[in-house]
């Protein structure tokens, strides 16, 4: 994906890179992860960070599971473009009526600089945000040093009223080495990947 030229004034390099990653995510629904790989900056598509490592009732210790529509969940996307030639505002909307009926209107609004691919961008944003936010915190998981933030792991757990069996993304990991044992505490995130 090629981002239109832009000026980033008084921004750190990290902020500029994050803006580029955010713009790419909005336009393509593809998430990329930038990380330090033993002194070498590496940029990877999240899909390329899958590991064939299973976390289940036997490899995980304790867990905490939450689901919410309070943050980062939108069932209506509205993009607005101020057309300076006509003096009118152009609106691009994507929405999911079934979720609006279930949750009410949860609207994402953004002003855009160009109408190029505006409808595609609205659809991509709806696809990205039109789901409950699900977080899973796992404690004392058998450790694997290859696991880092951004890694996708297979998680198969019974969570009471539902069964989870899917890849989830590691948002944060803490490795603990003690008495020749290695454990991890993981903050996981997934959207529609949780099966009911």
PLM features: what roles do these ranges have?
Residues 18, 22-24, 28-128, 135-176, ...:
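Acidic, small/polar-enriched beta strand-loop surface segments
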Residues 176-189:
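Short, solvent-exposed secondary-structure boundary/capping segments
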Residues 12, 190-195:
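Secondary-structure junction/capping motif
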Residues 1-19:
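Short acidic/polar beta-strand-loop edge motifs in secreted extracellular
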């Amino acid at each position: 994906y090629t981002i239109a030229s832009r000026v980033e004034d008084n921004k750190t390099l990290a902020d500029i890179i994050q803006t580029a990653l955010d713009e790419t995510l909005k336009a393509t629904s593809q998430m990329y992860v930038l990380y330090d790989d033993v002194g070498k900056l590496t940029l990877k598509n999240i899909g390329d960070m899958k590991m064939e490592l299973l976390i289940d009732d036997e490899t995980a210790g304790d867990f905490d599971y939450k689901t919410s529509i309070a943050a980062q969940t939108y069932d209506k996307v509205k993009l607005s473009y101020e057309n300076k030639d006509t003096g009118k505002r152009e609106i691009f909307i994507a929405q999911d009526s079934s979720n609006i009926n279930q949750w009410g209107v949860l609207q994402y609004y953004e002003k855009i600089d160009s109408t190029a691919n505006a409808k595609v961008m609205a659809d991509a944003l709806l696809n990205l945000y039109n789901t409950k936010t699900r977080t899973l915190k796992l404690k004392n998981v058998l450790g694997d040093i290859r696991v880092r933030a951004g890694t996708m792991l297979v998680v198969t757990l019974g969570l009471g009223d539902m069964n989870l069996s899917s890849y989830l993304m590691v948002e944060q990991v803490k490795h603990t080495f003690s008495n020749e044992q290695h454990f991890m505490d993981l903050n996981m995130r997934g959207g529609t990947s949780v099966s009911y």
